[in-house]
Design a protein with these regions (language model features):
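Membrane-embedded alpha-helical bundles that constitute the cytochrome b-like, heme-associated redox core
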Residues: 1-152
């Protein structure tokens, strides 16, 4: 409501928008890989086929998104935490703690993947946990409905 808005909360809204765009970039990479038949979900849906042939431009885009994934991931986590700090943690809406846990979950297992000093088994397990598309879907759904509940 307008009476609760402050200068900090106005900036926090914009930070949340930038975080949303970071998630769009992260999941654009996932979507492109699924469409190209890379990943276990697409192999189950389309055995031995791909929807799109592998054009050079798409490969270049995926290569860029692969190289920058870690940076967009770190930025997304930092922006979400900053957004929460600036807007306030609304624990009365149970969706928000769930979003926070899922975002930190993704960040933690993403960090385990890139940390070279961990044993291979731990890195493989971390990859399997981090690569679950359902976590990203959960973040999106819970964040959306949490914001809907706050706007009422």
């Amino acid at each position: 409501s307008p009476e609760r808005e402050t200068f900090i909360s106005e900036i926090g809204e914009e930070v949340g928008e930038v975080a949303l765009w970071a998630f769009y970039v992260i999941y654009l990479r996932t979507l492109l890989k699924l469409l190209l038949g890379k990943g276990s979900l697409s192999k189950r849906l389309l055995p031995d086929r791909t929807i799109i042939t592998h054009p050079t431009r798409v490969k270049l885009v995926i290569g860029y998104l692969d190289r920058t994934h870690i940076y967009f991931g770190i930025a997304a986590i930092a922006l979400v935490l900053l957004h929460i700090r600036m807007m306030g943690l609304h624990t009365e809406v149970w969706f928000f703690p769930a979003v926070l846990v899922l975002v930190l979950w993704q960040g933690l297992f993403g960090a385990f993947i890139s940390w070279r000093f961990l044993p291979g088994d731990v890195r493989r397990l971390s990859y399997m946990v981090h690569a679950q598309l359902i976590t990203g879907i959960g973040i999106g759904i819970f964040a959306y409905f949490g914001h809907v509940l706050l706007d009422d």
